[in-house]
Amino acid sequence: MLWERKGEREDMAISSKELAALLGVSPAAVSIALNGKPGISEATREMILKAAEEHGVRRAVRRETISEFINLLIFKRHGMVYGDTQFFSAVMEGISKTVAELGYKLQVSYFYENQNLEEQVKALSVSDCAGVILLATEMCDEDTKWFVGLGKPLVVLDSWFETWCPDTVVINNIQGAYAATRCLIEAGHRYIGHVCSSVEINNFRDRRAGFLKAITESDGEEKNRAYTTISVGSTQDTAYDDMSKFLDHIHNLPTALFMDNDVIAISCMRELKEHGYRIPEDVSVVGFDDVPMSYVTSPKMTTVHVPKEALGRHAVQLLLDRIRTGKQDHTVKIEINTTLKMRNTVRQMEKPGPK
C-alpha cells in the first residue's frame, strides 16, 4: 500500500516501509496501526497514528493486505534428527496452537541444505509473512549467513550459535544432561557411559557438556569413577545397529548409560535386551526428551522431560512481541528448563562395605 502526503502529487508518496523507518518501528507495526488491526500495544498504535497525522500521511486508494501468516521454517541439513517425529510433533503442536490463539495463521516451509539456499532465502524475504520461526535443530554456524539479513522479524528455535545472536528459544540441555548424570552418580554407579549421537548438533554438544560437568564434579567425591563414550547413529535403525556392533566386542559394559535422546535410548534398550542384559539389573538407562514411547517401554524409562509444547509457545510469543513493538535494541535467549522423570530403568547400587 502507498501512503501520500496530503496535497502532494502521487509521485511524492511514501511507502509503509519508509514510514516505519521514520518512526523506528517495523513495517508490520505501521500496517497494523494504520489499518486498525489488533496485534500491537496501544502505546505503539498511538505513536504511529500521531506521527502519521503530523506528517500528513493518509491512505491511498489502494489497500494493503496485512499479513496474517507466521512462517515456520524447518531447516533440513540431513533430516536424521527430524526423524524423531514424536518430539517435533509436540513442538509444532505448541506453535500451531499459539499462532491460532493469537489470531494468526501458520505456514510451514522447508529449506534444504542441498538446494539453492540463496534463492530460497530471496523467496522468503519477499513473501508476505509477518515473521519467521526458524527451526534450526540441524543448522550449524556456517548456515547462519543466509538468514542474517532476512529483513523480517525472526526467532530461532531449538539451537543457538556462537557467530549469530538473534532472538532464540532453546532447551537447557546442559542442565538436563547434568541432572541425568547426577542421578546415576547418586545411585552409586562408578562406571558410566554416554551414548552419544554420531550426528553433531548443538543440542547434543550441550548435553555432552552437561554430562562431563557432572562427571568432573564427581571426581572430587570419588576418585575411582570412570566414564566412556559410545557413538551411535541418531535414527532408530542406525542406533540399534551401532549398539549391536559395540556389544559384540565389549568386555566391560558400564553399569549405567546416559543417552542423547529417547530415540537412541529405546533402540539401544532393545539391543541390550537381545544381548541378554537386564535393565536395570545389569545396566541402568536414562534418556532425554520424554517422548510418549519412553513410558510404554518395558521397563518404563527414566528420562529428562522437555516441555516440548512450551518451546513452540514461547517462540511464537517472542516473535509476536517483536512484530508488535518493532523496535529492538537487543536480542534475548530463552532457555526452557527440564525435569528428571524417575521411572524404572535406574538401579540403586549397593554401597561398598568397610574394608
Which residues make up each language-model segment?
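Non-catalytic positions within long, well-ordered alpha-helices that form the structural scaffold/packing
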Residues: 21, 125, 185-188
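Short helix-capping segments at alpha-helix termini
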Residues: 101-102, 216-224, 249-252, 274-279
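Flexible loop/turn connectors
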Residues: 244-355
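Periplasmic-binding protein-like
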Residues: 129-135, 193-196, 229, 250-261, ...
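N-terminal helix-turn-helix DNA-binding module of bacterial transcription factors
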Residues: 1-66, 353
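Hinge/beta->alpha junction and helix N-cap segments in small-molecule ligand-binding domains
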Residues: 77-90, 108-115, 169-179, 195-244, ...
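Alpha-helical recognition/docking segments in bacterial nutrient-uptake
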Residues: 2-7, 11, 68-182, 246-252, ...
